[in-house]
């Protein structure tokens, strides 16, 4: 049977690092990029006698996440010890939640190819992150353990196996990432590992009612890797089934260099971790008043914001979706629109620049909107220069890039680079006459019906004027002199 005769079934476990200043059970910093083991203390090092103390901000962020995703917030939840041995886990167990998580149920709605899909959630629970093993590839082959990340607070968001393709899994994760960023609980930085996911993948013949044996693919930190890993794993399982071989339930790792998954270890079940209630922490009691306060503080979520952009500003679903994918970008867009002007036409102009040239420049520099030298007011100034005919499209692009990189004022860039358009009819007419005189054959063909030659003439005039002619005036004069 070909792959098309099988249905892939996917559930995701998303680990999101919470944007707290300190760790979940101690006061150590959660800052990324410090010297190895600089942000540690007896608690996160797992030293004897050190006792954990729960960070209240972690609970509030978990509740905030659960409310945004439509979960039931449990009034009482319990931490548990998840027992396993690994060099980056200093205590020999991870403090997580098992039987009584803080949030249950909920769902994530996402759009794929113009259709809405919904994936149900099983639960959201709080837990601490592990450390990081660092392997030296030099001759001595030494390995070290960096425990800066140990104890960093996470929420794990577990979906039901409702996803039916790699594309659905990617769009689900994009939608969830946008929600977490809009809530201010996660920065969405997959490269640094503050948002990563495991995928549980199985296949079954279409029409079958029983799910196949699942394999878990660990720690994917990009949308591209997630898609590649699921597609490879689905093919691998189908090939095993077609060959009459069993699919072994196991944990696998995705190798991005080879584009394939490979076996890590046999898949653990809950009993393998010997969960039991954490004796050093009391139950977490979440009062109804706290839940209602947090509910009242929830921001506009990405899906609602995108719908507002489409309904009130006339933006396309594509443009609106691109803007709300990052809450900081959407806020920057709102500020730029406020500085430039209201209405669908203004919104479209601003959106085009934000999702186009500014997105390209930000991708090159890796800068978040808060660090952009191109402010909303400066973009509005560029657009007003275009509206006034001072600069054209190509000139505006040069101005935007220069302002983005240097923070110079747009009008100063126009003067310094000599980008101002020539709108004087006399100057443009002289260039038009020169071009027509140099191309009498093409002019005759145009008058004979070859109207597509207008672009040729416009290009020649702009070349003659070193790109500074006002295109509207150039077009009008050419049409008049060519007899249109």
From Swiss-Prot:
- Enzyme Commission code(s) on record: 6.3.5.-
PROSITE patterns from the entry?
GATB (PS01234)
Which biological processes are named by the entry's GO terms?
A: glutaminyl-tRNAGln biosynthesis via transamidation; translation
Indicate yes or no for the key word Membrane: no
SMART domains under this entry?
Answer: GatB_Yqey
Keywords (A to Z) from UniProt: ATP-binding, Ligase, Nucleotide-binding, Protein biosynthesis
Q: Which class of enzymes does this protein belong to? A: ligase
Q: Does the record bear DNA repair in its keywords?
A: no
This enzyme catalyses: L-glutamyl-tRNA(Gln) + L-glutamine + ATP + H2O = L-glutaminyl-tRNA(Gln) + L-glutamate + ADP + phosphate + H(+); L-aspartyl-tRNA(Asn) + L-glutamine + ATP + H2O = L-asparaginyl-tRNA(Asn) + L-glutamate + ADP + phosphate + 2 H(+)
Q: Which InterPro entries match?
A: Asn/Gln-tRNA_amidoTrfase_suB/E, Asn/Gln-tRNA_Trfase_suB/E_cat, Asn/Gln_amidotransferase, Asn/Gln_tRNA_amidoTrase-B-like, GatB, GatB_C_1, GatB_Yqey_C_2, Gln-tRNA_amidoTrfase_suB_CS
Q: Which Gene Ontology MF annotations are present?
A: asparaginyl-tRNA synthase (glutamine-hydrolyzing) activity; ATP binding; glutaminyl-tRNA synthase (glutamine-hydrolyzing) activity
Pfam families from the UniProt entry: GatB_N, GatB_Yqey
Per UniProt, subunit arrangement is: Heterotrimer of A, B and C subunits.
Q: Which family does it belong to?
A: Belongs to the GatB/GatE family. GatB subfamily.
| Stated role | Allows the formation of correctly charged Asn-tRNA(Asn) or Gln-tRNA(Gln) through the transamidation of misacylated Asp-tRNA(Asn) or Glu-tRNA(Gln) in organisms which lack either or both of asparaginyl-tRNA or glutaminyl-tRNA synthetases. The reaction takes place in the presence of glutamine and ATP through an activated phospho-Asp-tRNA(Asn) or phospho-Glu-tRNA(Gln).
Name of the protein this chain belongs to: Aspartyl/glutamyl-tRNA(Asn/Gln) amidotransferase subunit B
Q: Which organism is it from?
A: Anaeromyxobacter dehalogenans (strain 2CP-1 / ATCC BAA-258)
This protein's encoding gene? gatB
């Amino acid at each position: 049977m070909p792959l098309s005769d099988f249905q892939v079934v996917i559930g995701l476990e998303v680990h999101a690092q919470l944007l707290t200043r300190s760790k979940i059970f101690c006061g150590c910093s959660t800052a990324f990029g410090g010297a190895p083991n600089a942000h540690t203390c007896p608690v996160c090092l797992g030293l004897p006698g050190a006792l954990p103390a729960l960070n209240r901000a972690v609970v509030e962020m978990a509740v905030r996440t659960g409310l945004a995703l439509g979960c039931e917030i449990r009034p009482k939840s319990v931490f548990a010890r998840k027992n396993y041995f690994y060099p980056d886990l200093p205590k020999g167990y991870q403090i997580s939640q098992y039987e009584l998580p803080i949030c249950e149920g909920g769902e994530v709605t996402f759009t794929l190819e113009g259709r809405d899909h919904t994936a149900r959630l099983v639960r959201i629970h709080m837990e601490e992150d592990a450390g990081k093993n660092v392997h030296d590839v030099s001759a001595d082959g030494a390995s070290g353990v960096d425990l800066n990340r140990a104890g960093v607070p996470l929420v794990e968001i577990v979906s039901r196996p409702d996803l039916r393709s790699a594309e659905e899994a990617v769009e689900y994760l994009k939608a969830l990432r946008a929600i977490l960023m809009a809530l201010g609980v996660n920065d969405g930085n997959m490269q640094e590992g503050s948002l990563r996911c495991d995928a549980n993948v199985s296949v079954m013949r279409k029409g079958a009612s029983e799910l196949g044996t699942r394999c878990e693919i660990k720690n994917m930190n990009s949308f591209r890797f997630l898609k590649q890993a699921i597609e490879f794993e689905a093919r691998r399982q189908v090939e095993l089934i077609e060959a009459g071989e069993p699919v072994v339930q196991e944990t696998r790792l995705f190798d991005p260099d080879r584009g394939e998954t490979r076996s890590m270890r046999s898949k653990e079940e809950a009993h393998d971790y010997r969960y039991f209630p954490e004796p050093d922490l009391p139950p977490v009691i979440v009062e109804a008043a706290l839940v209602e306060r947090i509910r009242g503080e929830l921001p506009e979520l990405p899906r609602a914001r995108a719908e507002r952009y489409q309904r009130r500003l006339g933006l396309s679903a594509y443009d609106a979706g691109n803007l709300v994918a990052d809450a900081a970008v959407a806020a920057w867009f709102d500020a730029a629109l406020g500085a430039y002007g209201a209405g669908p036409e203004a919104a479209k102009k601003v959106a085009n620049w934000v999702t186009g040239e500014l997105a390209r420049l930000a991708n090159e520099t890796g800068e978040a909107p808060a660090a952009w030298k191109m402010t909303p007011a400066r973009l509005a100034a560029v657009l007003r220069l275009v509206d006034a005919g001072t600069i054209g499209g190509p000139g505006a692009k040069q101005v935007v890039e220069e302002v983005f990189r240097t923070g110079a004022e747009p009008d100063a860039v126009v003067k310094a680079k000599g980008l101002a358009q020539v709108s004087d009819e006399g100057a443009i007419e002289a260039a038009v006459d020169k071009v027509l005189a140099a191309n009498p054959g093409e002019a005759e063909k145009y008058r004979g019906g070859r109207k597509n030659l207008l672009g040729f003439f416009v290009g020649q005039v702009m070349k003659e004027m070193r790109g500074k002619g006002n295109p509207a005036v150039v077009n009008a004069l050419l049409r008049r002199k060519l007899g249109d």
